[in-house]
């Protein structure tokens, strides 16, 4: 079976593991998944991320984060730009997620960054996902 949207699969695996309160999950590695995982870690949505090399493409191990009373830190993840319908924004159209409570992950000419960083650098790009 050929996977048509590995980013959507990655986000769905995080969402599903988060819903059943798993501590970790593993996904096949790629550069964009690594970048997304690093953003989620930097923004405080996940506890940690590890890269495990193997003979093939490698594995990304994501350590999920929960609050004091086991409440989920990630409420939801939503894929925006899809293979069948890409979503691009100009620098002045970069979206705010829940009035700044969430983040938009954007692929730009300067790499994968958050909506706040895109606004600060005044660049647009492809909106990959919303996380809140």
From Swiss-Prot:
Gene3D superfamilies (alphabetical): 3.30.1370.30, 3.30.1490.10
Keywords for this protein: Ribonucleoprotein, Ribosomal protein, RNA-binding, rRNA-binding
PROSITE patterns named among the record's database cross-references: RIBOSOMAL_S8
GO MF, one example: rRNA binding
BP-aspect Gene Ontology terms: translation
Gene Ontology CC terms: ribonucleoprotein complex; ribosome
InterPro entries from the UniProt entry: Ribosomal_uS8 (IPR000630), Ribosomal_uS8_CS (IPR047863), Ribosomal_uS8_sf (IPR035987)
UniProt-listed PANTHER family: 40S RIBOSOMAL PROTEIN S15A
Subunit structure: Part of the 30S ribosomal subunit. Contacts proteins S5 and S12.
Role description: One of the primary rRNA binding proteins, it binds directly to 16S rRNA central domain where it helps coordinate assembly of the platform of the 30S subunit.
Family according to the record: Belongs to the universal ribosomal protein uS8 family.
Descriptive protein name: Small ribosomal subunit protein uS8
Origin organism lineage: Bacteria, Bacillati, Bacillota, Bacilli, Lactobacillales
């Amino acid at each position: 079976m050929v996977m048509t949207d590995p980013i959507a699969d990655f986000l769905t695996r995080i969402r599903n593991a988060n819903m059943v309160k798993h501590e970790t999950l593993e996904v096949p590695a790629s550069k964009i998944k690594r970048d997304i995982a690093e953003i989620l870690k930097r923004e405080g949505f996940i506890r940690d991320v590890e890269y495990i090399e193997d003979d093939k493409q490698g594995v990304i191990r994501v350590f999920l984060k929960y609050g004091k009373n086991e409440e989920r830190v990630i409420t939801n993840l939503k894929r925006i730009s899809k293979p069948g319908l890409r979503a691009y924004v100009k620098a002045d159209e970069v979206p705010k997620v829940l009035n700044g409570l969430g983040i938009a992950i954007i692929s730009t000419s300067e790499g994968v960054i958050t909506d706040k960083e895109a606004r600060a650098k005044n660049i647009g790009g492809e909106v990959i996902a919303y996380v809140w």
